[in-house]
Amino acid sequence: MKIAIVGKGGSGKSTTSWLLSRFLAQTYSVLAIDADHNMDLASILGFEVKDDTRTFHRVHSEFQQIVGLEQDTKWSRIVLEDRVLPQFTFQPLDEFTQSISYEIDPHISLQVVGLGAEDILYSSRCAHGHSGPLKFYLPLLQEGDNQVIIDGVAGADMLHFGLFCGVDALVGVVEPHINSKKVFEQLRVLAAKLDIPFYGILNKPRENDLYNNIKQEYKDILLGEIPIDEAIIEYNFEGLNANTNEALKDIWSELQSRYIKVDTLARLRDFESKRAEKAVM
């Protein structure tokens, strides 16, 4: 399953991405993708992005060549034109996937978009442009029985770009905070328009009216909540208390029970087609 973790900045997206990656790595092989500006997931996993790290934003030409797209042409042509597209695989690793993946441990590999890299400064591309390869890589990635966790950019902007059309589920992290709830609702509405399954995880729970309101209003899509745990603050997975471990089991069980495999490439093709229609209006 390919799962993108989204939400308001500071809601706990990167921490949730780390928790799920570590939890799932106990049973599956996991591909963790850091698609955020801050590159916190990479840091939490103990990886340092350097000048020579092969990130998505540094392999544009190579990716375009692999998918048969001439340089300096619209990326949407990848899915809008009749062409034979490659399939990328996580296990076994295809050549391209292997070239941009870094082994964190025997069960977790990491890919990084690179939005926080120093060479982004003065770049002619915006964050959308730098994320282009990932956008078209995701629906072409065959994960098999493995799991893919993507730590997304804060807010709803990347949904407007269609970055997550290639995922099986969007999981919004929401905390009992008015702005966090506002962004969560924006994400929910956009996901519905894009026909991407959307679920929620309550983070930093505390008893107040907003907490109760969120639990009631979104009870049909909430997978569970992550309790306060000192080990989470210290990024000590082995030190998680029993309540946190049980919460992660419940969240994963809920997500699995709702999972329906769909053609994500067709979803991206539909998105780009509608986008092209809007552009000529």
Protein language model features and the residues they cover:
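Conserved catalytic-core segment of NTP-binding enzymes
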Residues: 19, 26-27, 126-234
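P-loop (Walker A) phosphate-binding loop of NTP-binding proteins
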Residues: 8
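Conserved lysine of the Walker
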Residues: 13
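Hydrophobic positions on the alpha1 helix immediately C-terminal to the Walker A/P-loop
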Residues: 16
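C-terminal boundary of histidine-terminating zinc-finger modules
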Residues: 236-248
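Hydrophobic anchor at the beta1->P-loop junction of P-loop NTPases
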Residues: 5
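N-terminal phosphate/diphosphate-binding loop that engages ATP/GTP or pyrophosphate donors
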Residues: 23-106
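Cytosolic-facing regulatory segments adjacent to core modules
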Residues: 86-105, 111-148
